[in-house]
Amino acid sequence: MGITVRNLQKRFGDFTALDNVSLDFPPGELVALLGPSGCGKTTLLRVIAGLEHADAGQVVLQGLDVASVGARDRQVGFVFQHYALFRHMTVFENVAFGLRVKPRRERPSEAAIREKVHELLKLVQLDWLAQRYPSELSGGQRQRIALARALAVEPKVLLLDEPFGALDAKVRKELRGWLRRLHDDLHISTIFVTHDQEEALEVADRIVVLNRGHVEQVGSPQDVYDHPQSAFVYEFLGAANRLPGTVAGRGFVAEGAAAPTEVD
């Protein structure tokens, strides 16, 4: 499913979280929303999901403006940063939850639910944990169960809010590769939020760099890294040598000192 947002505005009191944001997310891509805390990336994700309402602008899913469509009916799967698994339910029951709360006319049979849950647990390689409770799982296992639960309702779009932020570095790196392989198998439109530059560069097809509610740059990981379009982007993506100055003719003036430097 393709996603388009147009001229999104969102304020919380005096704070502007999204300031006239317009983006296109082609079907089947894995896109990273990258930026520092407070840049608007999670707010954008929640507006797309229908968990927040924009003050102005449009969210279009598969050609339909969903401003009046509730989160439940947007065919979106959402994975929260801290998993939000039900502690009193087993792994199996957590994954089955979305299917069991569907309206009666849309709800699969119990046999179909069991088959679907076991299929998803095999997909995330945790079918052997079906009868355990969340408290008996590692952080990485909980995250994969949360993802299986989101996939159970067969969403057209998958949204992930800092999915690996609460994990240690080794597990985070392993799950990044796993998510990339899973996406390549499923080809579901996926948007994930991260403040980890390495994570975005390694996993995403495209990166959207956000800063103070504005889109700074959109491009492939290589384009964004090799050709930053603003001082913020190159400073945020890693250590860089910055030489302030101006191009004058075919020369360069740095810190007020002219040098006969040729510029192509």
Swiss-Prot record:
Keywords: ATP-binding, Cell inner membrane, Cell membrane, Membrane, Nucleotide-binding, Sulfate transport, Translocase, Transport. ATP binds at residues 35-42. CDD domains: ABC_CysA_sulfate_importer. It is an enzyme of class 7 (translocase). Its main location: membrane. The keyword Transport applies. The complex is composed of two ATP-binding proteins (CysA), two transmembrane proteins (CysT and CysW) and a solute-binding protein (CysP). Disulfide bonds: none annotated. It comes from the Bacteria. The keyword Translocase applies. Belongs to the ABC transporter superfamily. Sulfate/tungstate importer (TC 3.A.1.6) family. It catalyses: sulfate(out) + ATP + H2O = sulfate(in) + ADP + phosphate + H(+); thiosulfate(out) + ATP + H2O = thiosulfate(in) + ADP + phosphate + H(+). It is a peripheral membrane protein. Residues 3-237 form the ABC transporter domain. Its EC number is 7.3.2.3. PANTHER family: SPERMIDINE/PUTRESCINE IMPORT ATP-BINDING PROTEIN POTA, SPERMIDINE_PUTRESCINE IMPORT ATP-BINDING PROTEIN POTA. It is found in: Cell inner membrane. InterPro entries: AAA+_ATPase, ABC_SmlMolc_Importer, ABC_transporter-like_ATP-bd, ABC_transporter-like_CS, P-loop_NTPase, Sulph_transpt1. It comes from Burkholderia cepacia (Pseudomonas cepacia). Part of the ABC transporter complex CysAWTP involved in sulfate/thiosulfate import. Responsible for energy coupling to the transport system. This is Sulfate/thiosulfate import ATP-binding protein CysA. GO terms for molecular function: ABC-type sulfate transporter activity; ABC-type thiosulfate transporter activity; ATP binding; ATP hydrolysis activity. The gene is cysA. One of its GO terms (cellular component) is ATP-binding cassette (ABC) transporter complex.
